[in-house]
Amino acid sequence: MKRRDFLKTSAVAGAALSLNFDGLQAALSSNTVAVEKAPDLVAVMGGEPAAMLDKALEALGGIGKFVKKGQKVVIKPNIGWDRAPEMAGNTNPELVAALVKKCLGAGAQKVTVFDHTCDNWQKCYETSGISDAVKKAGGIMMPGNDEKYYKEVAIPGGVTLKNAKIHESLIEADVWINVPVLKNHGGAKLTCAMKNYMGIVWDRRYFHSNDLQQCIADICTWNKKPVLNIVDAYRIMHKNGPQGKSLSDVAQLKTLIASTNIVATDTAALRFFNQVEKLDISAVGHIGKGEALKLGTSNLDKLTIKRIKI
């Protein structure tokens, strides 16, 4: 890394970190209480990926609440780009590996990980660090680069999207967990839990040609919902996404957000993103469209939120 880029990155990360704990606390202050029952949404700040995952799952009731013994589990991270972890173009490999171990520890029959990548799939899997991390954790990497891996399903709840070819591993799985990285996106404006669904389908060109924001919301109505959404915001690409141009596009914020409510997940993540780079919720149209389709709520005042600082 060039010294100039390093200094720029350090400055950005430092500024963002100063906003993180105070800013996120304010952004997610509604109905934030110490609760005995599982909260609707958890935000963990200040730790390493595995430690933050531990805290989030503990607050939500444990991994056993989401994964049962003997189940086939799919973990769907973002692995779309031939980028190293430091660029925050993909989900943090440490988080993915930790989640694989959690699922296997809960008695999962097998844990499969895949993405329909944008760059060459083998390079994405390798450079992201996810393939190596998953295999070492005991999981299975599945390709997503060929149409033969996808099966057509109906999307009866969709407004624009009425059917789609979805990866067979998801169709065959008992449960799946949605694990996006939080980042800027030129087209969708924000990549998070809802946008991460685009990596489960074969024909993404249809999305881009037929109201991208609506199609993102539509695909999320597919009847097999993730049992949990876990947002990786350990590092975030706050500009020039989805690939990024340099490390100056990245801020290290050491945060994780988890919820079963996908619209609330993206709303909370957007509020967090706004502590670094301003983006109005109206620009991220799929959030409002998802709420209109009754996928969840963007009104965080209605939810119980637990914040944890490590």
Where are the model-predicted features located?
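N-terminal and secondary-structure boundary signal
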Residues: 1-310
